[in-house]
Amino acid sequence: MKKLIGKKWLLLKAVATFLLSGCASLEQKAQDSVKEVTENVTQTISNDQRIPADFVRHVDGDTTVLKIDGKEQKVRFLLIDTPETVKPKTKVQPFGLEASKRTKELLSTASEITFEYDKGDKTDRYGRALGYIFVDGTLLQKTLVSEGLARVAYVKEPTTKYLAELEQAQEQAKNESLGIWSIPGYVTQRGFSK
Protein backbone atom coordinates (compact mmCIF):
# COMPACT_ATOMS: atom_id res chain seq x y z
CA MET A 1 0.00 0.00 0.00
CA LYS A 2 2.84 2.39 0.89
CA LYS A 3 4.48 1.51 -2.43
CA LEU A 4 1.26 2.39 -4.30
CA ILE A 5 0.90 5.72 -2.46
CA GLY A 6 4.57 6.47 -3.14
CA LYS A 7 4.11 5.74 -6.86
CA LYS A 8 0.96 7.89 -6.99
CA TRP A 9 2.80 10.66 -5.16
CA LEU A 10 5.73 10.37 -7.59
CA LEU A 11 3.32 10.42 -10.54
CA LEU A 12 1.53 13.45 -9.09
CA LYS A 13 4.88 15.24 -8.68
CA ALA A 14 5.84 14.40 -12.27
CA VAL A 15 2.51 15.69 -13.63
CA ALA A 16 2.74 18.86 -11.51
CA THR A 17 6.32 19.47 -12.66
CA PHE A 18 5.31 18.94 -16.28
CA LEU A 19 2.34 21.29 -15.98
CA LEU A 20 4.30 23.95 -14.16
CA SER A 21 7.11 23.84 -16.70
CA GLY A 22 4.49 24.18 -19.44
CA CYS A 23 2.93 27.18 -17.67
CA ALA A 24 6.31 28.76 -17.22
CA SER A 25 7.00 28.17 -20.88
CA LEU A 26 3.65 29.75 -21.85
CA GLU A 27 4.26 32.67 -19.52
CA GLN A 28 7.72 33.19 -21.04
CA LYS A 29 6.24 33.07 -24.56
CA ALA A 30 3.63 35.65 -23.55
CA GLN A 31 6.31 37.91 -22.06
CA ASP A 32 8.42 37.54 -25.21
CA SER A 33 5.41 38.45 -27.38
CA VAL A 34 4.65 41.54 -25.29
CA LYS A 35 8.31 42.57 -25.46
CA GLU A 36 8.36 42.14 -29.24
CA VAL A 37 5.20 44.22 -29.74
CA THR A 38 6.54 46.93 -27.42
CA GLU A 39 9.83 47.05 -29.31
CA ASN A 40 8.00 47.32 -32.64
CA VAL A 41 5.80 50.17 -31.40
CA THR A 42 8.82 51.92 -29.91
CA GLN A 43 10.67 51.61 -33.21
CA THR A 44 7.67 53.03 -35.06
CA ILE A 45 7.57 56.14 -32.87
CA SER A 46 11.26 56.52 -32.22
CA ASN A 47 12.27 60.04 -31.20
CA ASP A 48 14.67 60.33 -34.12
CA GLN A 49 12.55 58.66 -36.76
CA ARG A 50 10.55 60.64 -39.25
CA ILE A 51 7.33 58.92 -40.17
CA PRO A 52 5.86 59.46 -43.66
CA ALA A 53 2.54 61.29 -43.52
CA ASP A 54 -0.15 62.53 -45.87
CA PHE A 55 -1.95 65.86 -45.63
CA VAL A 56 -5.67 65.33 -44.92
CA ARG A 57 -7.02 68.75 -43.98
CA HIS A 58 -6.03 72.07 -42.56
CA VAL A 59 -7.17 73.37 -39.15
CA ASP A 60 -5.17 76.55 -38.47
CA GLY A 61 -1.61 77.88 -38.33
CA ASP A 62 -0.28 75.39 -35.77
CA THR A 63 -2.67 72.44 -36.08
CA THR A 64 -3.50 70.12 -38.97
CA VAL A 65 -4.83 66.66 -39.71
CA LEU A 66 -2.38 64.15 -41.17
CA LYS A 67 -2.64 60.49 -42.06
CA ILE A 68 0.15 58.75 -40.13
CA ASP A 69 0.59 54.99 -40.39
CA GLY A 70 -2.76 54.80 -42.19
CA LYS A 71 -4.65 56.59 -39.43
CA GLU A 72 -5.97 60.17 -39.48
CA GLN A 73 -4.60 62.18 -36.56
CA LYS A 74 -5.03 65.78 -35.52
CA VAL A 75 -1.51 67.11 -35.01
CA ARG A 76 -0.40 70.07 -32.88
CA PHE A 77 2.97 71.49 -33.92
CA LEU A 78 5.51 71.39 -31.10
CA LEU A 79 7.30 74.49 -29.78
CA ILE A 80 5.30 77.14 -31.66
CA ASP A 81 2.13 79.19 -31.37
CA THR A 82 0.40 81.09 -34.16
CA PRO A 83 -2.28 83.76 -33.75
CA GLU A 84 -5.80 82.35 -33.40
CA THR A 85 -8.27 81.96 -36.25
CA VAL A 86 -10.66 79.22 -35.10
CA LYS A 87 -10.64 79.36 -31.30
CA PRO A 88 -14.20 79.67 -29.94
CA LYS A 89 -15.06 83.06 -28.40
CA THR A 90 -11.82 84.56 -29.74
CA LYS A 91 -11.65 87.05 -32.60
CA VAL A 92 -9.32 86.30 -35.46
CA GLN A 93 -5.99 87.73 -34.35
CA PRO A 94 -3.59 89.77 -36.51
CA PHE A 95 -1.46 87.50 -38.73
CA GLY A 96 -3.62 84.51 -37.79
CA LEU A 97 -5.09 84.21 -41.28
CA GLU A 98 -1.66 84.62 -42.86
CA ALA A 99 -0.20 81.88 -40.64
CA SER A 100 -3.15 79.61 -41.35
CA LYS A 101 -2.98 80.16 -45.12
CA ARG A 102 0.79 79.61 -45.15
CA THR A 103 0.49 76.34 -43.24
CA LYS A 104 -2.22 75.12 -45.61
CA GLU A 105 -0.20 76.19 -48.66
CA LEU A 106 2.97 74.41 -47.51
CA LEU A 107 1.19 71.18 -46.59
CA SER A 108 -1.14 71.01 -49.59
CA THR A 109 1.67 71.52 -52.13
CA ALA A 110 4.31 69.34 -50.46
CA SER A 111 5.87 66.45 -52.35
CA GLU A 112 6.80 64.79 -49.07
CA ILE A 113 5.53 65.27 -45.51
CA THR A 114 7.11 63.56 -42.53
CA PHE A 115 6.20 63.65 -38.85
CA GLU A 116 8.60 63.30 -35.92
CA TYR A 117 7.85 62.83 -32.24
CA ASP A 118 10.13 64.32 -29.59
CA LYS A 119 10.87 63.01 -26.12
CA GLY A 120 8.04 63.52 -23.67
CA ASP A 121 4.31 63.27 -24.24
CA LYS A 122 3.17 61.98 -27.62
CA THR A 123 -0.29 63.58 -27.28
CA ASP A 124 -1.77 66.61 -25.52
CA ARG A 125 -4.83 66.78 -23.26
CA TYR A 126 -7.06 67.11 -26.33
CA GLY A 127 -5.74 63.88 -27.86
CA ARG A 128 -3.76 65.64 -30.58
CA ALA A 129 -0.45 64.10 -31.62
CA LEU A 130 2.47 66.36 -30.69
CA GLY A 131 5.38 66.57 -33.07
CA TYR A 132 7.49 68.23 -35.69
CA ILE A 133 6.32 68.46 -39.28
CA PHE A 134 8.80 68.37 -42.14
CA VAL A 135 7.68 69.58 -45.56
CA ASP A 136 10.02 68.43 -48.32
CA GLY A 137 12.74 68.02 -45.69
CA THR A 138 12.29 71.47 -44.10
CA LEU A 139 10.96 71.93 -40.56
CA LEU A 140 7.54 73.59 -41.00
CA GLN A 141 7.72 75.19 -37.56
CA LYS A 142 10.98 76.91 -38.53
CA THR A 143 9.45 78.27 -41.74
CA LEU A 144 6.54 79.81 -39.84
CA VAL A 145 8.80 81.31 -37.16
CA SER A 146 11.29 82.63 -39.78
CA GLU A 147 8.49 84.38 -41.66
CA GLY A 148 7.15 86.05 -38.50
CA LEU A 149 3.95 83.99 -38.50
CA ALA A 150 4.61 82.09 -35.25
CA ARG A 151 6.34 82.57 -31.94
CA VAL A 152 8.37 80.00 -30.01
CA ALA A 153 6.11 78.77 -27.21
CA TYR A 154 5.05 75.89 -24.98
CA VAL A 155 8.62 74.92 -24.21
CA LYS A 156 8.61 71.99 -21.80
CA GLU A 157 11.53 69.70 -21.08
CA PRO A 158 12.34 67.21 -22.50
CA THR A 159 10.51 68.30 -25.68
CA THR A 160 13.19 70.66 -26.96
CA LYS A 161 14.97 68.93 -29.85
CA TYR A 162 14.70 71.87 -32.30
CA LEU A 163 14.40 74.67 -29.73
CA ALA A 164 17.77 76.33 -30.44
CA GLU A 165 17.06 76.35 -34.18
CA LEU A 166 13.63 77.88 -33.65
CA GLU A 167 14.87 80.50 -31.19
CA GLN A 168 17.54 81.56 -33.69
CA ALA A 169 14.90 81.89 -36.44
CA GLN A 170 12.67 83.88 -34.08
CA GLU A 171 15.47 86.28 -33.18
CA GLN A 172 16.07 86.99 -36.86
CA ALA A 173 12.33 87.55 -37.54
CA LYS A 174 12.19 89.91 -34.53
CA ASN A 175 15.22 91.87 -35.72
CA GLU A 176 13.61 92.27 -39.15
CA SER A 177 10.17 93.15 -37.64
CA LEU A 178 8.47 90.46 -39.71
CA GLY A 179 4.79 89.60 -39.31
CA ILE A 180 3.80 89.32 -35.64
CA TRP A 181 6.94 91.24 -34.68
CA SER A 182 5.85 94.29 -36.72
CA ILE A 183 3.23 95.26 -34.11
CA PRO A 184 4.85 96.69 -30.96
CA GLY A 185 3.77 94.81 -27.82
CA TYR A 186 1.65 92.29 -29.76
CA VAL A 187 3.68 89.20 -28.86
CA THR A 188 3.71 88.40 -25.14
CA GLN A 189 4.91 85.50 -23.00
CA ARG A 190 1.31 84.25 -22.85
CA GLY A 191 0.45 84.64 -26.52
CA PHE A 192 -0.81 87.60 -28.49
CA SER A 193 -2.25 90.77 -26.95
CA LYS A 194 -4.88 91.76 -29.50
What spans do the regions from the language model cover?
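Small beta-barrel nucleic-acid-binding modules, primarily SNase/OB-fold domains
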Residues: 2-13, 19-194
